[in-house]
Amino acid sequence: MSFSPLIRQLIESLRILPGVGQKSAQRMALMLLERDRSGGLKLAQALTAAMEGVGHCRQCRTLSEEELCPQCADPRRDDSLLCVVEGPLDVFAVEQTGYRGRYFVLKGHLSPLDGLGPEAIGIPELDARIRDGAFSEVILATNPTVEGEATAHYIAQLLADRGLTLSRIAHGVPLGGELELVDGGTLAHALAGRRPIS
């Protein structure tokens, strides 16, 4: 079956979403056109508004509709702590823990195979933010992947002589998890990162 040019354009546009392949995009496009045109128009309006109205916070670089995001605009936050994360969703996740320091959002992680070096993910901007701030501790909260670990290591090397406390988020057995269900790599990290009981 051959789709009309407008339907093909809609399908191709939907395919830019993560995890959406050709078949899923076709199903979504046809569902919107056949069953929920008002929902499709509402989606188009919300997408246009977000693309035009959402930018990046000038301090931490998370997504924001204002020049400063709510976390950077809050004077009650701890200016001595800086948490470095890979993306805006990570800020949301860390906020759920009650963390009250500042953030810096990278644009992903180092990935030379994908052409993502230090400049592409914002390491020079991080360096400038740390130089301009009054931070005493930098928390490296990149993901526990090979690329996330490499990114944390690179940043730690860059900041090693600054007189800052550098810390890495812990990895290991999830709270409430059972050891027999934990994979070997995760358990090895948990054992290597063990700490004394006080």
Swiss-Prot record:
Pfam families: RecR_C, RecR_HhH, RecR_ZnF, Toprim_4. PROSITE patterns: RECR, TOPRIM. Belongs to the RecR family. GO terms for biological process: DNA recombination; DNA repair. GO terms for molecular function: DNA binding; zinc ion binding. This is Recombination protein RecR. Coiled coil: none annotated. Residues 80-174 form the Toprim domain. May play a role in DNA repair. It seems to be involved in an RecBC-independent recombinational process of DNA repair. It may act with RecF and RecO. Keywords: DNA damage, DNA recombination, DNA repair, Metal-binding, Zinc, Zinc-finger. It comes from the Bacteria. CDD domains: TOPRIM_recR. A zinc finger (C4-type) spans 57-72.
